[in-house]
């Protein structure tokens, strides 16, 4: 009886794993789904999307990103976003605030504002 119980338990676990891996991604959000970015989300997205490749390359060589070396840069970006300034993230007279806060934009659209 215990062998059949363990077999049934393993089969149930395998079935749950297969169902989750097959159907589990239906309700997850695609990373490039357009979304609204306002306030402090703008500098956070800017740092994440524009400096991710540079930071990953620096990690491979053991160097930190220049933004992390200067601790004040991150807080400066966040402070500017709180004051609703469209700082240096502008493209052809349309700032990132107008483009991604007033209507949703994808990661690919946001990366166009990387300088």
UniProtKB/Swiss-Prot annotation:
Keyword Signal: yes
Domain of life from the UniProt record: Eukaryota
GO molecular function: hormone activity; toxin activity
Disulfide bonds: 38-101, 50-114, 100-105
Gene3D superfamilies hit by this protein: Insulin-like
Signal peptide start-end: 1-24
Keywords annotated in UniProt: Amidation, Carbohydrate metabolism, Cleavage on pair of basic residues, Disulfide bond, Gamma-carboxyglutamic acid, Glucose metabolism, Hormone, Hydroxylation, Secreted, Signal, Toxin
PTM sites of type 4-hydroxyproline: 34, 104
Free-text tissue specificity from the UniProt record: Expressed by the venom gland.
PTM-bearing positions, type Cysteine amide: 114
Matching InterPro entries: Insulin-like, Insulin-like_sf, Insulin_CS
Oligomeric and partner information: Heterodimer of A and B chains; disulfide-linked.
Reported function: This venom insulin, from a fish-hunting cone snail, facilitates prey capture by rapidly inducing hypoglycemic shock. It is one of the smallest known insulin found in nature and lacks the C-terminal segment of the B chain that, in human insulin, mediates engagement of the insulin receptor (INSR) and assembly of the hormone's hexameric storage form. Despite lacking this segment, it both binds and activates human insulin receptor (long isoform (HIR-B)) with a high potency (EC(50)=12.0 nM).
More info: Is possibly an allelic variant of Con-Ins T1B (AC A0A0B5AC90).
Protein name: Con-Ins T1A
Phylogenetic classification of the source organism: Eukaryota, Metazoa, Spiralia, Lophotrochozoa, Mollusca
